[in-house]
Amino acid sequence: DESRPDFRVMDAATRSMAARLTPGTLVSYETTLPVGTTRGRYKPLIEEVSGLVEGRDFDVVFSPERVLTGRVFADLARYPKLVGGLSESGEARGVRFYEAVLAFDQRDDLPRPNGVWPMGGAEAAEMAKLAETTYRDVNIGLANQFARYADAVGIDVARVIEACNSQPYSHIHRPGIAVGGHCIPVYPRLYLA
């Protein structure tokens, strides 16, 4: 069923990691998951395989990757690192970890300082990743529909989009072949999982 995520690889990696887990470990998932998966799927799996208890023996956080291939290090410095824990203490530990290993660009355009942003729970961090990628998916699809319409009525869509994006409430992407890639078309379906 293409509407459901295939967790087999993540499950196998989690089992392998959990079999070797030692007390005091911080586990961080850096991927894209349906909301609730870190807590509802991976916490119980880690506990079952390791025999340890999350929040007491180890901590789990979800911290989505927000980088593009070919510009990973630049993106790590450019964008806030989102961290959501399964417990307050685990989230604080995850924040301290990422603050210790990442450096961030100065950005005056953000609502708060660039750096590690605690999300108040793994579910909020999972949803943030889905929301930003779904926004991109919808925006690309919308731009493509504008282009189709403009072509049908003889209007230069590039000029229209440039005009729309001249004010701060519009962020229309450029139209292209379609919404593509290995991730963006798939992520909106994770709301249904």
Spell out what each predicted region is:
Residues D1-A193:
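Structural/interface elements that position substrates and couple domains in central-metabolism enzymes
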